[in-house]
Structure formats: C-alpha cells, structure tokens
C-alpha cells in the first residue's frame, strides 16, 4: 500500500493511494464483525456469574477469582502479545484466538468443578488476548490511511458485542442452564 502525507488545515493525514475504497470497507467491516463476535462471547462470562455462583455454591471470593483469572489472562496478556506480534506479525492468531475461546466455551458449558471453571475463564481470556492485538493491527493496515475511522469502526464492533452478550445470556443461557453456553461456539466459529 502506497501512502503519502497530506496537510489539511495544518494537520497531517496519511492517505492510501492504491487501495480500493470497497476493499477497505470490507476488510475493516469483517474485522469489526469478528470483534463483535469475540467481545459478545467475552461479555457472557460475567453475565452468568450469578448462575455459576448458584450452580457450584460459590462464595463471592470464588466468583471474584473467576473474574480475576479471566481479566489477568484477557487484559494483562494483551500488551505482551501485541509487543511480540508488532515485531513478528502473525495474522493466523485471529483464528487461533477464536479456537482458544471455543475451547474455553466448551469447558465453561460442561464444567464439573470450580477448578475447571477457572481453566475455562483462563482460556476465554487467552483467546481474547490473542485476538485483539492482531485484529487491531489488521484494521489499521486495512484502513487506507483512515486510521481513526478504522479504529472506531473496529471498536464499535467490540462495544456492540459487549452490549449484546449479557442480553444473549439472559435470553438463551439463563433459561436453559449452563450447558446452553455451548451454543456460543457458533460465534467462535463465525469469528
């Protein structure tokens, strides 16, 4: 992709010269949809904490530990993965992240114990941490120089998924029980 710097009102803008606008929209849109699906899955976990608490007779400390494991793996791992993939781009990490999330969903749906819930939370977090840095990089690369538009479109996808996840949990998982979490695998497969 060839880029040039243009000044408009004293502000530098990078503009792609040779990437078709339709291709930019399709790629950024696809990454935003994948972000929606990823974050939808991530948002279901905290939404079902009350169900997990009841099913496993967990204390609030144990629910907090589930959240801690998920957040440590899902948040604190991201910068390290981003640092590595900035030096060694790995586009295949997008589907790898979704496969790891897929495994976490299956474990969560059929978890027989608190220890397995922790493993499921860790896998869901690792899947998210693996997905986000590469997906963000792809959105930027496909932006055609419109970095702000690409990033905001990517972010809207994730925020929409975060908004839909708890609603999906209330409508489909809570009425049918913990095993209904397995239905989320379709989102991991689509992502």
Residue ranges and their predicted role:
Residues 76-114:
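Conserved MFS/SLC helix-loop-helix module at the cytosolic interface between two early adjacent transmembrane helices
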Residues 43, 71-79, 162-163:
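Residue-level signature of mid-helix packing/kink "hotspots" within the transmembrane helices
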Residues 30-50, 58, 81:
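Extracytoplasmic
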Residues 100-105, 124, 188-191:
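MFS 12-TM fold signature
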Residues 31, 115-121:
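Short hydrophobic/alpha-helical segments at membrane-entry points of transmembrane helices
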Residues 120-157:
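Cytoplasmic helix-loop-helix junction between adjacent transmembrane helices
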Residues 154-191:
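Helix-loop-helix hairpin linking two adjacent transmembrane segments in secondary transporters
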């Amino acid at each position: 992709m060839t880029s040039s710097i243009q000044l408009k009102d004293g502000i530098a803008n990078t503009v792609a010269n040779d990437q078709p606008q339709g291709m930019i929209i399709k790629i950024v849109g696809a990454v935003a949809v994948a972000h929606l699906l990823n974050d939808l899955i991530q948002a279901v976990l905290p939404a079902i904490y009350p169900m997990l608490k009841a099913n496993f007779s967990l204390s609030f400390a144990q629910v907090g530990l589930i959240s801690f494991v998920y957040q440590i793996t899902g948040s604190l791992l991201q910068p390290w993965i981003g640092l590595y993939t900035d030096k060694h781009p790995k586009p295949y990490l997008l589907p790898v992240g979704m496969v790891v999330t897929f495994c976490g969903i299956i474990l969560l749906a059929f978890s027989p114990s608190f220890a397995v819930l922790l493993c499921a939370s860790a896998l869901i977090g690792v899947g998210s941490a693996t997905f986000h840095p590469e997906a963000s990089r792809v959105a930027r690369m496909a932006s055609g120089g419109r970095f702000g538009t690409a990033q905001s479109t990517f972010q809207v996808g994730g925020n929409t998924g975060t908004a839909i996840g708890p609603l999906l949990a209330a409508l489909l998982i809570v009425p049918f029980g913990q095993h209904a979490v397995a239905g989320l695998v379709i989102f991991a497969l689509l992502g």
